[in-house]
Amino acid sequence: STINEIVEEGMKAEKRKYLYKNLWIEKELTMLFGTTNTGKSLFAVQIAEEIARNGEKVIYFDYELSEQQLSDRYENADRTGHYVFSENLIRPNLDMDKYASYKERLKKLFERMEEASKLGIKIFIIDNITYLNPKLSDGVEASKFIINFKSKMEVLGVSVLLIGHTPKEQKNKTVLTLDKLAGSKNISNFIDSCFAIGKVEGENKIYIKQLKARSCAISLDENHVLVGTFTKRDDGLFEFAEEGTAMEKNLLKGKTDITPQKEHAFKLYQENYSYRKIASMIGVNDKTVKAWIQDYISYHNVKSYNYMDNNEIGLNNDNNNQLYSV
């Protein structure tokens, strides 16, 4: 087929829905990640409930909480009742799956998704990715896993939101990028879209940032992150209460550790030294240098072209912040 024929055929298909804002689109594999205690699961449940309230059946595969823990979370303050979820929101009992090997766990998940798909259920949230494969820090393993996962869901024609995490050593004082996702590029290269939750330093607030989108323009970028707080309503539901948008660097300003050493590394990068050369000059490894330079650029909202790397980096054209991702 020619490209024109493919486009024309696609135009005849039913337009895909935006499942939640422009962060998750129908028939796409989307990742939500953040550090511990940022409210990833609370937000994922809120997303699932909103979709279910709009008439779509959603299955939430929860490998994190026991049924009692879930009950405790969503009961009201005086324990006389609980939040009444939509009947379209389904949560299978996965207690026995937790004791299986991760390979067996993944096999059972695919079987459940296939059975549900035959019944017309096409929207799934999985909390979280670590239970499906604990070896995602290995680049080769991560690539094999995510390619296999995406091929399975494409055959079924389903939409999946995967909950991820950041490596434990990551701190909240740096800007959110795809590099902060555990598994890094080996996962992020193959997902369709990605958004993340960050902490506002010094306040009991969080923010949402859009990091990748294949099918739409990125709206919640570093200049317009969505700020809010998680509050428990009187009816028992935890809700992300939106307060407006802000520049990410302002939420971290005065907290991000931009040291003289990082500034020196950035100046050397502007002088067209490679990451490896800068690392040898300063006495750290090249990955550290790259992270320092990205932090500096994100914090100061600047960009730089390096002829040695043949790569221009900056907030508006960094691979992590493309208008459309490829």
Residue map of PLM features:
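Active-site catalytic microenvironments for nucleophilic, acid-base chemistry
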Residues: 50-54, 296
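C-terminal regions of RecA-like/P-loop NTPase motor modules
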Residues: 117-118, 155, 200-326
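N-terminal pre-Walker A segment at the start of P-loop NTPase domains
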Residues: 1-19
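Hydrophobic positions on the alpha1 helix immediately C-terminal to the Walker A/P-loop
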Residues: 43, 47
